[in-house]
Amino acid sequence: KVSYLKSFFANNLLRFIMDVFRINIKKYDLIISDFEPISAWSSKLKGKPSLQLSHQASLFSKQSPRPIEIDRLAEFFIKWYSPCDRYIGFHFKDYDKNIYGPLLRDKIVRAKPRTEDYYVVYLWNYNVDYIANILSCFKNYQFKIFDSRIENNLQIDNCEVIKTGDDSFFNAMLNCKGVICGAGFELPAEVLYLQKRLYVIPIG
């Protein structure tokens, strides 16, 4: 479960405050950020106009989907982590007048996907052995697990574990049956655009 207070204090609070006041934004007419707190808070405290472009910004609108049970602490965190004067949000649908669909990489839009007999797995916050142990129960399926922490590629039962690299991951995603990943935004948006099966694990 995500602890917002723990996440906040795990970072150096004093260093954050110093960076907010140290950053020089005097010569800029507008500060544009991507859910980045230092420039956002600096512009707010110094009276500079600011614009946020991000998926998280879409949650500023009450029209964006919410769970049935609202997490007030999460709402507070989203609102004040990276404050701004105006925003343009990106989501899976245009839920409000200043919310637009996902921004996709050119190579995703130009891609010609195929369907081969394997699934791509990208769960960076889980241990590879833990993932492989679960997926090895599905003997009739093949999985390509991507992880940046391994030194060399290896095979664990029906799971090929591959060191994460942009080209290798992109090619694997392009030609897979489906993707198993965290419930973020950018990667799921690309997977859905490529019309692949998508399985997500929410953070919570």
Residue spans for each PLM region:
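Conserved nucleotide-sugar phosphate-binding/catalytic loop shared by glycosyltransferases and other
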Residues: 1-14
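Nucleotide-sugar donor-binding patch of glycosyltransferase catalytic domains
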Residues: 54, 67-70, 161-164, 197-204
